[in-house]
């Protein structure tokens, strides 16, 4: 099988110098549900609440998966009380889409609001200056969508230009940065609010002896929302840029569309992930890096800071080994995976927030761990790789 990467959209912007018109991230906010689970005890809870404690071998396998995940805890909307009220969520293959939808259409925008409010507070400008809203989720589908609900929750202008992105997968966080960059740079004076909100209730269900991928989903995904505000030409003294979005591209690995699949069924969103996914991503990341950084004369991957989507520990280990990265390069990605699990579209934005906060705490010279150039990587169904070249700003 060929693994040569094919560029689908967005040729690289060959601009080696900073342009005033380039989009900047002006604020970041994140939020999680108050409820959280300890990964070490989660197998006991999961098999008990799904009435599956008799599946002893399956439970021990799940425990091994959890122990190898390098995840310490995850925040979840799911509680024992919620599951007892809705037992159809706990049985594999039981029709439960209506129940899931009723919960998700409320919880997804609410969590998104919490993240958005934090970003807006950091931004420090009137909410009326938001001109565009992009909302992304893999959790639930509704019309009017979560974007519409969020405009009401935040009190945005009725004239705000909305875009709802459903079912995009784990590459979506990086893809939303690409989209926000395009919107900001083509709408002078525009301020784009991007919100990624994910609730893993869409994939929660009891174990299946026939579908072992389901156990990986139950171990891996967590709930969280992240928001960024993007615009060009920050107002001096009124707006403080955090990162510059320099260029962006999306690629797919040929003949891999069946390797990572999420499908909406009567029992909710099903999950399939081939064991070949980590190695396929690992084999193709460097080609994306070369295309991205060649215009800027950069080929030392340890000279940049990294925002790598932690789809799983195997992906982090594989990329680190393949590229010869120093251990600290993927520290932020590993930390977010450890504390939150895989947050799907919100994950890279959580990592971006972690990087800039730790850079300030450690008294680094820039928001990018003291370095100038960085990369955001998102991986998702397709197999799709989204790559965003970013530039840090000095920390005053």
Curated annotation (Swiss-Prot):
Keywords: Acyltransferase, Flavonoid biosynthesis, Transferase. The active site is at 170. It catalyses: (E)-4-coumaroyl-CoA + 3 malonyl-CoA + 3 H(+) = 2',4,4',6'-tetrahydroxychalcone + 3 CO2 + 4 CoA. It is an enzyme of class 2 (transferase). Pathway: Secondary metabolite biosynthesis; flavonoid biosynthesis. PROSITE patterns: CHALCONE_SYNTH. It comes from the Eukaryota. Gene3D superfamilies: 3.40.47.10. Pfam families: Chal_sti_synt_C, Chal_sti_synt_N. One of its GO terms (molecular function) is naringenin-chalcone synthase activity. One of its GO terms (biological process) is polyketide biosynthetic process. Its EC number is 2.3.1.74. Belongs to the thiolase-like superfamily. Chalcone/stilbene synthases family. The primary product of this enzyme is 4,2',4',6'-tetrahydroxychalcone (also termed naringenin-chalcone or chalcone) which can under specific conditions spontaneously isomerize into naringenin. This is Chalcone synthase A. It comes from Ipomoea purpurea. The gene is CHSA.
């Amino acid at each position: 099988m060929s693994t040569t990467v094919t560029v689908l959209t967005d040729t690289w912007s060959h601009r080696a110098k900073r342009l005033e018109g380039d989009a900047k991230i002006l604020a970041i906010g994140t939020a999680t549900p108050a409820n959280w689970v300890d990964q070490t005890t989660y197998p006991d809870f999961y098999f008990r609440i799904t009435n599956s404690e008799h599946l002893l071998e399956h439970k021990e396998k799940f425990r091994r998966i959890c122990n190898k995940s390098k995840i310490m805890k995850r925040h979840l909307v799911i509680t024992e009380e919620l599951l007892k009220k809705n037992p159809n969520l706990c049985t594999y293959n039981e029709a439960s889409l209506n129940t899931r939808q009723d919960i998700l259409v409320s919880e997804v925008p609410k969590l998104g609001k919490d993240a958005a409010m934090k970003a807006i507070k950091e931004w420090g400008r009137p909410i009326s200056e938001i001109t565009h809203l992009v909302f992304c989720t893999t959790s639930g589908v509704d019309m009017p969508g979560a974007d519409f609900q969020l405009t009401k929750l935040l009190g945005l202008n009725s004239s705000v230009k909305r875009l709802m992105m459903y079912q995009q997968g784990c590459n979506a966080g990086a893809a939303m940065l690409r989209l926000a960059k395009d919107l900001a740079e083509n709408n002078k004076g525009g301020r784009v609010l991007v919100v990624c909100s994910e609730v893993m209730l869409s994939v929660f269900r009891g174990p299946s002896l026939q579908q072992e991928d389901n156990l990986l989903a139950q171990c891996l995904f967590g709930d969280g929302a992240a928001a960024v505000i993007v615009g060009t030409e920050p107002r001096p003294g009124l707006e403080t840029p955090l990162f510059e979005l320099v260029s962006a591209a999306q690629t797919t690995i040929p003949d891999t569309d069946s390797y990572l699949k999420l499908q909406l069924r009567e029992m909710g969103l099903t999950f399939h992930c081939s064991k070949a996914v980590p190695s396929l991503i690992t084999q193709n990341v460097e080609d994306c890096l070369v295309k991205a950084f060649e215009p800027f004369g950069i080929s030392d991957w340890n000279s940049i800071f990294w925002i790598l989507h932690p789809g799983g520990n195997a992906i982090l280990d594989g990329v680190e080994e393949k590229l010869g990265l120093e251990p600290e390069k993927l520290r932020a990605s590993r930390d977010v995976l450890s504390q939150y699990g895989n947050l799907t579209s919100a994950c890279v934005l959580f990592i971006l927030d972690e990087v800039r906060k730790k850079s300030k705490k450690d008294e680094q010279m820039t928001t990018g761990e003291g370095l100038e150039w960085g990369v955001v990587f998102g991986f998702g169904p397709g197999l799709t790789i989204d790559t965003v070249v970013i530039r840090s700003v000095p920390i005053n």
